[in-house]
């Protein structure tokens, strides 16, 4: 199993465990997450309840601009490496906090990994809030990995 695929497997396992515990609701409770299709896009919008955000431990950090001295190819955006998620074909993504309790997956191109920082060749702009803790669980929610309808 390649490094890329073992990372995906690790994310999927974590997502199943967390989402199963987060997905149980009673008739009086709202579902923990709503997945809404966005017109003209194949990437949906995820809206979580406050309780789901708390249970998943969602944490965000803003995209930062790398100092020119830190990156030999000039100014690039940087994010914490844990914000990067991989889908089944190895594509790299981040979840951007687009509104209150709302997240949307956005493609990124990782130019380099320097310790716990991913240097981006393309991705969200400086200042955008990316999910650094809980991104794998959001991917599981988007793809309904828990198997619940």
Task: Say what each PLM segment does.
Residues 63-77:
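Short, glycine/small-residue-enriched coil/turn segments at secondary-structure junctions
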Residues 2-4, 22-65, 93-149:
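Short alpha-helical boundary/capping segments at helix-coil junctions
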Residues 77-83:
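Sequence-composition feature that favors extended, apolar/low-complexity stretches
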Residues 11-14, 23, 73, 116:
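Generic anion/oxyanion-binding catalytic loop in active/binding sites
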């Amino acid at each position: 199993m390649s490094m890329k695929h073992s990372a995906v497997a690790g994310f999927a396992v974590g997502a199943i465990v967390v989402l199963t515990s987060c997905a149980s609701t009673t008739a009086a409770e709202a579902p923990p997450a709503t997945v809404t299709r966005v017109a003209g896009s194949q990437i949906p919008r995820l809206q979580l309840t406050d309780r789901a955000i708390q249970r998943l431990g969602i944490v965000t950090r803003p995209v930062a601009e790398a100092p020119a001295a830190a990156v030999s190819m000039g100014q690039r955006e940087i994010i914490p490496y844990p914000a990067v998620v991989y889908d089944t074909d190895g594509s790299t993504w981040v979840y951007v906090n687009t509104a209150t309790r709302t997240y949307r997956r956005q493609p990124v191109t990782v130019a380099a990994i320097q310790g716990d920082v991913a240097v981006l060749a393309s991705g969200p702009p400086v200042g955008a809030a990316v999910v650094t803790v809980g991104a794998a669980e959001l991917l599981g929610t988007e793809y309904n990995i828990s198997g619940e309808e």
